């Protein structure tokens, strides 16, 4: 992420803007006129917004196609310049109101604050939470940034503070109205006078301190990053990524991308209480190992840490997402996964539990214990799993052993477990991830993958693990 000069976001008056055609991809009948209008408003709002006179800066992209390509590039989507379902899905996710691309001058602003001791004031409160819960969320959000910089934040109870925090709905006094429930959640202004540093939260949202509604701490920590001078990040694992994702109840750790950004502005603090900040995996890292792989409705999902790559057929560039951005109720990290295509289900394993999912939805009654599959109670986790649709059998790997589960009769096959080395000689005594395709099983062990022929029962090729990601 490159910290830069932010300007206050502009929510435009569309009736004064000259409409430009928005190209769509595939079957245009799949996209409604409402979707096309929504996409155009989105692009005008977040990619080279106009100034108050409705005039684009001369060096800004002026066509909808160019803006759409920028948006697809920003979010790591296939860059086609055409509106498709995947692009529209990203556009419809709840997000911050600050633009992703576009530099424009409305209010005077600076790159960063010229002082390290900043003040903030909570002007009003949301009715969704107690005053104490709101104050705790904001204090915790500021601490995210003060932990890694020399910045100090002091709360004022009256008067004018550097960062004025308020809740409002629709038009709330800054000419940049909110849009009702979901969609645009909040916005903040960059360092500077007047509105500089101020953060506004849409009170049409349901604010909480949990996974329900929108977590106020997470949104506030993001907005305060803008208040301090940070732009949006293209890194889907960064706090400053524009799309909201609930990241779990465990102790929050500021991702490395955000640490690098804020420290480039203010320098490091004296002592970082959490020196190990999570990094986003690099798909072309030669030492990359993978956690799990599964197909899902014709696509391939490749899991690593709290992320997964989504690989479409006939597409080279894999799209990277946080796992919780698709399945908020799943753990951040998973151990294994497999698809049961005829039932339109995927099964996800983490520790002693497993989940059954239909698309985005977790089936009722899950998670269940892996011991319910017939595994002995001493098995603490499944490290890899692969399903064979023609036989209805699923291989489950744990440690140096493999079990075979009968998905049709819901029992574990006899004569199992077996040693991995005996059934699949040459691949090693453990499996990190596995999938099957066209009569071959692909075993992943550390940074290496083995292409194993089912017919000849032998290894036919050894490749880097990340070759599945076209590296």
From Swiss-Prot:
The motif Cysteine switch: which residues? 94-101
Q: Which residues bind Ca(2+) 1?
A: 128, 203, 205
What EC number(s) does its UniProt record assign? 3.4.24.-
Write out the PTM section of this UniProt entry: The proenzyme is activated by removal of the propeptide; this cleavage can be effected by other matrix metalloproteinases, such as MMP2, MMP3 and MMP14 and may involve several cleavage steps. Cleavage can also be autocatalytic, after partial maturation by another protease or after treatment with 4-aminophenylmercuric acetate (APMA) (in vitro). N-glycosylated.
Where is the sequence biased in composition, kind Basic and acidic residues?
A: 273-284
Region (Interaction with collagen), start-end ranges: 268-471
What's a Pfam family this protein contains?
Answer: PG_binding_1
Q: Which residues are recorded with the post-translational modification Phosphotyrosine?
A: 366
Residues carrying sugar: 117, 152
- Where, in this chain's numbering, is Zn(2+) 1 bound? 172, 174, 187, 200
Q: Which organism is it from?
A: Homo sapiens
Q: Tissue specificity, please?
A: Detected in fetal cartilage and calvaria, in chondrocytes of hypertrophic cartilage in vertebrae and in the dorsal end of ribs undergoing ossification, as well as in osteoblasts and periosteal cells below the inner periosteal region of ossified ribs. Detected in chondrocytes from in joint cartilage that have been treated with TNF and IL1B, but not in untreated chondrocytes. Detected in T lymphocytes. Detected in breast carcinoma tissue.
Protein name from the UniProt record: Collagenase 3
């Amino acid at each position: 992420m490159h910290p830069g000069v932010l300007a206050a976001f502009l929510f435009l008056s569309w009736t004064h803007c000259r409409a430009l055609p928005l190209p769509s991809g595939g079957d245009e009948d799949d996209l409604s006129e409402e979707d096309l209008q929504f996409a155009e408003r989105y692009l005008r709002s977040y990619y080279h917004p106009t100034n108050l006179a409705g005039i684009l800066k001369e060096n800004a992209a002026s066509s909808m196609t160019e803006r759409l390509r920028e948006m697809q590039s920003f979010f790591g989507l296939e860059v086609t310049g055409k509106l498709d379902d995947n692009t529209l899905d990203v556009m419809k996710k709840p997000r911050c109101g600050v633009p992703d691309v576009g530099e424009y001058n409305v209010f005077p602003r600076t790159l960063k604050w010229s002082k390290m001791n900043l003040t903030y004031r909570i002007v009003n409160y949301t009715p969704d939470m107690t005053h104490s819960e709101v104050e705790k969320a904001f204090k915790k959000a500021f601490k995210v940034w003060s932990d890694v910089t020399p910045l100090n934040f002091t709360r004022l109870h009256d008067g004018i503070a550097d960062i004025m925090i308020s809740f409002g709905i629709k038009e709330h006094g800054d000419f940049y109205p909110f849009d009702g429930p979901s969609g645009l959640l909040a916005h903040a202004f960059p360092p500077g006078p007047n509105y500089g540093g101020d953060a506004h939260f849409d009170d049409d949202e349901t604010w909480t301190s949990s996974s329900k509604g929108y977590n106020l701490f997470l949104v506030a920590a993001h907005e305060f990053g803008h208040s301090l001078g940070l732009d949006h990040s293209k890194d889907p694992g960064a706090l400053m990524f524009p799309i909201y994702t609930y990241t779990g109840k465990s102790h929050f750790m500021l991702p490395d991308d955000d640490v690098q950004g804020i420290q480039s502005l203010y320098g490091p603090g004296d002592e970082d209480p959490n020196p190990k900040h999570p990094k986003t995996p690099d798909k072309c890292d030669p030492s990359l190992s993978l956690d799990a792989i599964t197909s899902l409705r014709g696509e391939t999902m490749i899991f690593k840490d709290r992320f997964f790559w989504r690989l479409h057929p006939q597409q080279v560039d894999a799209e990277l997402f946080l796992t919780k951005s698709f399945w908020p109720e799943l753990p951040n990290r998973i151990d294994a996964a497999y698809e049961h295509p005829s039932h339109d289900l995927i099964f996800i394993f983490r520790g002693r539990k497993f989940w059954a999912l239909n698309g985005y939805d977790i089936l009722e009654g899950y998670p269940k214990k892996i011991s319910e599959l017939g595994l002995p109670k001493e098995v603490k986790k499944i490290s890899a799993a692969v399903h064979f649709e023609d036989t209805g059998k699923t291989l489950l790997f744990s440690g140096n052993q493999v079990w075979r589960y009968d998905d049709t009769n819901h029992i574990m096959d006899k004569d199992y477990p077996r040693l991995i080395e005996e059934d699949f000689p040459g691949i090693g005594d453990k499996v990190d991830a596995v999938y099957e395709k066209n009569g071959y099983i692909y075993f992943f062990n550390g940074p290496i993958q083995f292409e194993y022929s089912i017919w000849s029962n032998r290894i036919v090729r050894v490749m880097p693990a990340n070759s599945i990601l076209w590296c």
